[in-house]
UniProtKB/Swiss-Prot annotation:
Root EC class: hydrolase
Keywords for this protein: Cell membrane, Cytoplasm, Hydrolase, Membrane, Protease, Thiol protease, Zymogen
Organism: Xenopus laevis
Gene from which the chain derives: casp1-b
GO molecular function, one term: cysteine-type endopeptidase activity
UniProt catalytic activity: Strict requirement for an Asp residue at position P1 and has a preferred cleavage sequence of Tyr-Val-Ala-Asp-|-
Protein known as: Caspase-1-B
Entry GO terms, CC: AIM2 inflammasome complex; IPAF inflammasome complex; NLRP3 inflammasome complex; plasma membrane
GO biological process: positive regulation of cytokine production; positive regulation of interleukin-1 beta production; protein autoprocessing; pyroptotic inflammatory response; regulation of apoptotic process; regulation of inflammatory response
Length: 382
């Protein structure tokens, strides 16, 4: 539809009048294609009807196929004479516009399903100011941080970690985030990387962030590459990145540019050695699936943390496929991010771990101490 709108763009501009433009802007605003401030900007910025019309069309085109389709449909339904002169006629919604849920369920989903204009409108109509604001793509600078430790000075290699890194990188890119990626960092280097990321000026032009940590772990924290298991240490491991350090780095004092914006922390690491099953673990002791675990201390406002397992238990990783938690998280995000808030998607991930047979390796991801005050929709494609 963007190509079709581009084809008739000049003719629409030449045939427009003030009343028609006002009608179209009202319709686009009602259907959440254009926001209030965008309509106000179009009206105030332009002195002539032609300029207003040109600005309106170009603003809609930038939003993609769905938005372009809505503008053309509005033109056909409300301004038939002009539409007919342009060769535009009423048509059924395109297959892209309406997701066929049966088709989606019947095949493996390897990429994020985009949010349609209809879904976007329905979500805003249903929830309104109860959802976190999503900034327009133009000028938006979403950032995400991934730290993935695979090799260690005194611990086993986390085989399969590269697959987790590739999968999370792809997922976050498809959700519109520019990923800052680090591998094999010591505890001090992890702290430095987080502080530098928290200080980035681009957060002022963002609407949210993801922080993903994947490593070996123990109950109080996440292992750096220099972590070692001790005989008499309080927690048994040295050089742990304490979970409290993660949250304090991104609180409203230390990361003010992300104030009032969702901050999503995802941790794939063991939190102990108790097993709900057996694969390979990401605790400090070697085990063939491998496990990862960690403990949560404090969260800040508008934050949510999703752990790969409950306290004192292991998290499992397949050396040839990647971590079970990361695999299922990516699957559910690909499938549901277009229509469900993040908290509900996390519940779907948790449900996928429930009621496994005694012969299967078990773990239970947990959402802990969320301080989200609204629903967080990702609206992929917007």
């Amino acid at each position: 539809m963007t190509a079709q709108l581009n084809k008739v763009r000049k003719a629409i501009i030449n045939g427009c009048n003030p009343a028609m433009i006002s009608d179209l802007l009202d319709d686009l605003q009602d259907k959440h294609v254009l926001k209030d401030y965008e309509v106000e900007h179009i009206n105030k910025k332009n002195n002539t009807s032609r300029d207003r019309c040109r600005d309106m069309i170009d603003s809609v085109k930038k939003k993609g196929e769905y938005s372009s389709n809505i503008l053309l449909e509005s033109l056909v339904k409300n301004h038939k004479t002009l539409a007919e002169s342009l060769g535009l006629h009423e048509h059924a919604p395109s297959p892209i516009q309406e997701h066929n849920e049966d088709t989606i369920k019947d095949k493996e989903i390897n990429s994020v399903i985009p949010c349609s204009a209809e879904e976007f409108k329905n979500i805003y109509d249903s929830h309104g100011d109860k959802i976190y604001e999503v900034r327009e793509r133009e000028g938006r600078k979403r950032l995400a941080l991934i730290i993935c430790n695979e090799t260690f000075q005194s611990m086993s290699e986390r085989r399969g970690a590269k697959l987790d890194l590739e999968g999370m990188n792809k997922l976050l890119n498809e959700l519109g985030y520019q990923v800052q990626q680090h591998t094999n960092l010591t505890k001090a280097e992890m702290v430095k990387a987080m502080k530098e990321f928290a200080a980035r000026e681009e957060h002022a032009d963002s609407d949210s962030t993801f922080i993903v940590l994947m490593s070996h772990g123990d109950k109080p924290g996440v292992c750096g590459t220099d972590s070692k298991k001790t005989e008499n240490g309080q927690y048994g491991v040295t050089n742990l990145l304490q979970v409290d350090e993660i949250f304090s780095t991104f609180n409203n004092v230390n990361c003010s540019r992300l104030w009032d914006k969702p901050k999503v922390i995802i941790i794939q690491a063991c939190r102990g050695e108790n097993q709900g099953g057996e694969l390979v673990r990401d605790d400090v002791a070697p085990a063939p699936l491998e496990d990862d675990a960690v403990h949560h201390v404090q969260t800040e406002t508008d934050s949510i943390c999703f752990y790969s397992s409950t306290p004192d238990t292991a998290s499992w990783r397949n050396p040839t496929k990647g971590s079970v938690f990361i695999i299922r998280l990516i699957e559910k995000m690909n499938e549901l991010a277009h229509c469900q808030p993040l908290g509900d998607i996390f519940l779907e991930v948790q449900s996928s771990f429930k009621d496994k047979s005694p012969n299967q390796y078990s773990q239970m991801p947990t959402q802990e101490r969320s301080t989200m005050t609204k629903k967080f929709y990702l609206f992929p494609g917007y």
